[in-house]
Amino acid sequence: MNASAGTKDWYAGRFTQFEEGLNGASQTPLHALRRRGFAAFAAQGFPTTAEEEWRFTSVAPLAATHFHPVLAYAASGFAEPDLRPWSLTGTGGIVLVFINGHFSSGLSSIPPGSPGVSVGSLGAALAHDPALALRYLSPERRGGDAFTSLNTAFLLDGAFVRVGDGVTLDAPVHILSLASSGDTPLLVQPRHLIIAGNGARLSVVETYGGKGPGLYLTNAVTEIFVGEGGAVEHDKLQMENLSSFHVGTTMVSLGGEASFTSNAINFGGAIVRNNVNALFEGERAECTLNGLSVATGMQHVDNHTVIDHAKAHCQSHELYKAVLDGSARGVFNGKIFVREDAQKTDAKQTNKTLLLSDEATIDTKPQLEIFADDVKCTHGATVGQLDEEQVFYLRARGIGQTEARDLLTFAFATDVINRVHVDALREKLDALLHARLRQGRVNMET
Amino acid sequence: MSLLEVRNLHAGVQGNAILEGINLRVEKGEIHAIMGPNGSGKSTLAGVLAGREAYVVTEGEVLYQGKDLLGLAPEERAREGIFLAFQYPVEIPGVTNMYFLKAALNAIRKHRSMEELDAMEFLSLVKEKMKVIDFDQSLLNRPVNEGFSGGEKKRNEIFQMAVLDPTLAILDETDSGLDIDALRIVAEGVNKLRSPENAVVVVTHYQRLLNYIVPDFVHVLIDGRIVKSGGKELALVLEEKGYDWIRGESGAVTADAQEAGSK
């Protein structure tokens, strides 16, 4: 199609421009990876709704816009006060700030180093140790799509977090990605790499937000490696501005007896697609994927998860909830693979959606592909309105009609927030949720 | 002025008449029992008084403290001092008992132009009221009724009643599903909450609750009408002779009611 060809030509032109600016750096292993990424993107193009994985989510508005990849750091008018609404007070942890996908050392806060912990800019880490790229950054092998390929093609910067064997990081690492577009729509593509050694423990919080109403596309990729017996909590708060697009892909590998928890919270964005792909690479590991999407107006929020039980004796738990109002549209697609050798797998998936309006819709699709015989896999999905008997019970005790509705909606949603173990984030999320649930509706303009 | 005055109340659900002309007067300080067989309209009466929207009032009126009750929303009735103890208390996952009760109490206080209680004041009130009903503190921080046993749910209703301190409490089959020990605890709670300033309407199928909550008046509801009223001894006669005795004694009334119901 013309539009598709036009889109590819546009990004091909941007890629050539990018390469020309690299000079000698175009011979590095990293750049070979980028080239592979661009070739994969050019071969696929942006997905259409004809593809099964994108049946319910049209990215046509996004493919029709010529976004400009951001190739270098610029402060873009961001200063310290812009960070305050996003800050997680009292954690005393590391804060890595990215402006339009590029590390800002001035705005970041990295307390004096502790042994076994390296954090900072991925761009800097790759410059220091080019072999990192070959060792860890290879999304294609784990089912990356056109968006991950596009991210790889322009891979420049993002967060780098490595915690050595047996090291516990008490305070969370906060990765704050802020975007700002003027008249030129920007393509913001942070690439985060998080490596937890054997027995290492840490929490990472990713937040995404925009300044001003300008249109941009965040296309973020996060790769997480959890070593044997390691434990990682990954919390993500997506609050892009309401005209912009967010595609986020989180890819996780779990070693034996590792534990990983993802809490993906979505409040913002016009069209949002989140992919969380987890792969068990060792036995007796545990993976928990939780999600909450609160949307209204014309927002479209698509959550795709894949849990690949490639090894035996692993457990996965999944709870995705959505509160949809206005003409918002939700999608949940939860795939669970249980490979032939993955005996004694225990997988549970739940998707619950609360619709506050007649126009809001959800497409929910559990997908279990089980090739082993001694396993326990359950899934369930519910879609509905508030329970009127619960509403009456609250009213019969003196609580007003709309307060009762807000309270019940809040309770439904905060069930996911309660699973966040980073106290400062959980409190922030509760406050954000409270602000959004008013008069029995979802309000995004707060 | 009576606390509650029900005049010729007709009500039904989805076009089916259930109440066919209820008259009832309740004064402060009184306990009234409304007894009747299954399907007689007892829970409908309780529901209409509390403001359940499924019920449609087709005739008659209800005055509460001299004012029209039926025009008020359920929450307004609660704020004016009406409390319905549910036959089937509802589970509310994600909302703790404490949070729920504080929201309810403060909504009521706000309506009465009283200052809202802060967390500390509320906690001390709750601790005091817990003693009334021997309520387990661990249930306070659990979601409302979620995973509670039948007895715990009913006890929670009376605990809420203790905290909200209603002027008119309507207990809808609070005895159903309770063993004798739980029944006694619930009844003792209600008795402790009695005062010359409030009234209780006990809706029940069986007489046994009335051994513990002794009513001043007993009304027998059959086929949507109060067919007989008397003192506490009426409950004992009913226990002995059954509802058929009343049906036989007031056969004409019952026949009328059936005729009206079939229209």
Task: Describe every region a protein language model picked out.
Chain B
Residues 217, 221, 225-248:
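Conserved beta-strand-loop-alpha-helix hinge in the C-terminal portion
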Residues 4-6, 19-21:
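Conserved structural motif at the start of ABC-family nucleotide-binding domains
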Residues 16-17, 76, 184:
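Short coil-to-beta microelement around the adenine-binding A-loop and adjacent beta1/P-loop entry
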Residues 170-174, 181:
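Walker B catalytic motif
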Residues 61-77, 145:
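ABC ATPase NBD Q-loop/coupling interface
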Residues 90-167:
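ABC-family P-loop ATPase nucleotide-binding domains
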Residues 35-37:
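The feature captures the beta-strand-to-loop junction immediately N-terminal to the Walker
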